[in-house]
Amino acid sequence: MRGLSMLLRVLCVAALTLAFGGVAAGIMGKAEAAPYETLMVPSGAMGRDIPVAFLGGGPHAVYLLDAFNAAPDVSNWVTAGNAMGALGGKGISVVAPAGGAWSMYTNWEQDGSKQWDTFLSSELPDWLAANKGLAPGGHAAVGASQGGYAAMALAAFHPDRFGFAGSLSGFLYPSNTTTNGSILAGLQQFGGVDGNGMWGAPQLGRWKWHDPYVHAALLAQNNTRVWVWSPTNMGGDAAAMIGQAGEAMGNSRMFYQQYRSVGGHNGHFDFPAGGDNGWGSWSGQLGAMSGDIVGAIR
């Protein structure tokens, strides 16, 4: 069983470390010389086909979820995050959906075109099981920024599908009063999106239903392997972070405390002074966690 490792860093701040029915289009692409397929996976929930970069390698897969400014056709994990180079040849498959910009990869109450939780937790794994021979469950979800939130939420609420969750600069406490205001402001500023259409106005209380911090006990009870990385440096890709890197940093630390308080012991938490909230650092972290992912799901 994987234990919990601790690392204390003092570099101006203290950093704690605890050691997602149709025919696919077989378009071939390359990322760092690793060939992948672009699958068009039908989503009945969203009423359209979703482009998914797929690299076969085993029955269990890593689902890679993009930051807020996700590209419409090819995941930024493929074009900027070197996902295929980092994960190819390790005995696991790679699944990277595109088109999830400004969505938090959740089911929106007032926008039928954004039903990402249904797609990632049901439609996509079922389609991959039927068409690519993947296992129905036992996968990993890893994401940056909004994708970090979604990875943790998918693992918390769909443990039959996901046994590993990785969050890089993720918003892990969205129902926090300061955080929900920041998310709403950032969605409007960078995406022109009214975030109240997601889970309703924050004061109505439904944001808590979807919150990994509030439901951290589920991750602890299921012994889900978690990896959380968030730097103290506020620099990086502003659009990818909707200008709210500080909220992600604070959220990750509060999530760590909550996870520990409910008995969580199967996590890696790292809050370094180095790195930033952008693809150079996120790509490096994906490579760093690759062995951990393989050990958890292969």
Regions found by a protein language model. Give the residues of each.
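Secretory targeting and sorting signals
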Residues: 1-33
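Non-catalytic cap/lid and distal C-terminal segments of serine-dependent acyl enzymes
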Residues: 28-298
